[in-house]
Amino acid sequence: MPRRDRNMDSAPCMWMRGGTSKGGYFLRADLPADTAARDAFLLAVMGSPDPRQIDGMGGADPLTSKVAVVSKSERPGIDVDYLFLQVFVDQAIVTDAQNCGNILAGVGPFAIERGLVAASGDETRVAIFMENTGQVAVATVRTPGGSVTYAGDAAIDGVPGTHAPIPTEFRDTAGSSCGALLPSGNAVDVVNGLPVTLIDNGMPCVVMKAADVGITGYEDRDSLDANAELKAKIEAIRLAVGELMNLGDVTEKSVPKMMLVAPPRDGGAVCVRSFIPHRAHATIGVLGAVSVATACLIPGSPAAEVAVVPEGARKTLSIEHPTGEMSCVLEVDDAGNVVSAALLRTARKLMDGVVFV
């Protein structure tokens, strides 16, 4: 385990729910500059490695063991830089190998609350550079009277109640981690005897039919997590595709995500059960949803074979998941390439103070 600086035993922090995840939001200046010291500090903050994370702030779940590191940007046209860090629950690992579109939902409000971005009218647009992949997202935050409000009438599945909407636009996300939308160059690859699509439109994913790995694709999260045979099968595929996806050895990485697709049951475009990567997701990650939605548009792919895709250049695809759905709006050009994606998220400030280790 990395050793942390014993002189650093606390830091200012805001704990927020972002989308269907939650975690700690820090200003970059409030964390150790040295990466190893920073990671050791964050492991202590979360209480990792420990399956219960009992001595830290983590919630014994990858979805609640996340960190956003935010700073004012010096890039033209960008307001803030955002680094996402996934803190493993039961291993002493902190990784920046992926983005998180759910935690991203809290970055705009946090930046305004911390004075990195000035509120401008009833709505404030915040341009966010995602350091993990070098891409840009623009979040629109409600700021009536010059202050962030978290109250509103927007609902997202997986989160009780309603909150202020935070629409977020993504552009140029294709190949953000893998170098190409289809890093292997193929719409379909056969891995361990199964047809899969290796895709990266903001999140590296392996998309395959649920039926091909012996499930329906409609199981609940607990059933999936209890299925050791299924998890071993998809983990073998995940490890086999690391090099094909230009990700190298993915043994200790949180990508690629594993997406098991089935025909929609509730009027959506496709039904998905996702692994992140070793545990089933309660919903689906934002950028994972973008990648799956994009896969639905690729002729001959496993996703396209089960999906119901609307017509038109602007397509709204409802991605069904274990606790509801997530709608992803894709814009395609004349050649059928996805040029932008937009999703609706919400966020809420849970705590603002000092975290101790």
Curated annotation (Swiss-Prot):
- Do you know which Pfam families this protein is assigned to? PrpF
A biological process from GO? lignin catabolic process
Q: Which InterPro entries match?
A: OMA_tautomer-like, PrpF-like
Keywords of this protein's UniProt record, alphabetized? Aromatic hydrocarbons catabolism, Isomerase, Plasmid
Q: What NCBIfam families does its record include? A: OMA_tautomer
- GO MF annotations in UniProt: isomerase activity
Family designation: Belongs to the PrpF family.
Its annotated pathway reads: Secondary metabolite metabolism; lignin degradation
Q: Which gene encodes it?
A: ligU
Q: Which top-rank group of organisms is this from?
A: Bacteria
**What sections of the sequence does the record tag as coiled-coil?**
none
| Species of the source | Novosphingobium sp. (strain KA1) (Sphingomonas sp. (strain KA1))
Q: Could you say which EC number(s) this protein's record lists? A: 5.3.3.-
User: What catalytic reaction does the record list?
Assistant: (1E)-4-oxobut-1-ene-1,2,4-tricarboxylate = (3Z)-2-oxo-4-carboxy-3-hexenedioate
Q: Which protein, by its recorded name, is this?
A: (4E)-oxalomesaconate Delta-isomerase
| Function as written in the Swiss-Prot or TrEMBL entry | Contributes to the degradation of lignin at the level of the protocatechuate 4,5-cleavage pathway. Catalyzes the isomerization of the double bond between C4 and C5 in (4E)-oxalomesaconate (OMA) to (3Z)-2-keto-4-carboxy-3-hexenedioate (KCH), where the double bond has migrated between C3 and C4 via a 1,3-allylic isomerization.
